[in-house]
Amino acid sequence: MSMRSTFVLRVFAFAFAASVATYPAAAQLRPGPLPPPANAPPPVVIPAEPKPEPPPVPVPEIIKRFSENEQAMLVAHGSYVYKKVVRVEEIDDNGKPAGTFQFTTELTPLPDGRAYERELKHPETSLNVLNLEPESLSPLLKIPPLPFIPSQLVHYDVNYVGTQKLDELNTYIFRVEPKQVERQHAYFKGVIWVDDQDFVIVKTLGHWVTELGEISTDNFPFKFFDTYRENVQGKIWFPSYLRSDDSVNTKHGLVHVRLVVRWEDYKARTAAPAPAPQQ
């Protein structure tokens, strides 16, 4: 089987809880933070405040609640299907795309409860510098969609930075750094934004590191990821947008490259209810 076929037929196993509670029905989904415009400059990490004002909810309680909600949403994530659009651009000196690579997949359920990514649109490319196939983007598979569950958060130092308004959301900001890096396991290092109503993570900004450094390859130069989540149902917030800007060194100089991933059309793929996040 070709590498391309292997990618298209990659099977994902999802674990389902034997007994789960029901999410409360939501009259209206809450708008999440808006992704940046296509021509926006790369984001800058917010500097830590020397002594931020204490939040109205104790910091340990905020951390406990958002990590427990992350766990509940991770379980719920296995009962959804979605489309994924991956686009890579080479940017010219005027900030315009000079070449693109794009493909679209859909997570499709199987009768046995598993699912696979089915190719909806054949990869199209007009890139001049990068030589990409879908398999070139395999480092993306190492980035978990909902990584800050309690069992993983114990490996991090989580420090409260302050508050920030993200469009219509009021958020708490935390710096997250691994206590220790490992050779085989990647850890997040960066900043997360937590909604002050649902106590869920709505935005992350940072990179994934191992003992050997940041996750990247020659054909995947992207290291720093700006990720946004959207309110899918009730208090469920799933990733909807990821962006990374970097550069590639060529004989003609540095070439600006950009990665954008969009997750669209989240739909429940089973009638089994999902566990509700903590109130």
Q: How does the language model describe each region?
A:
Residues 192-194:
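Non-globular disordered terminal and juxtamembrane segments underlying protein topogenesis/assembly
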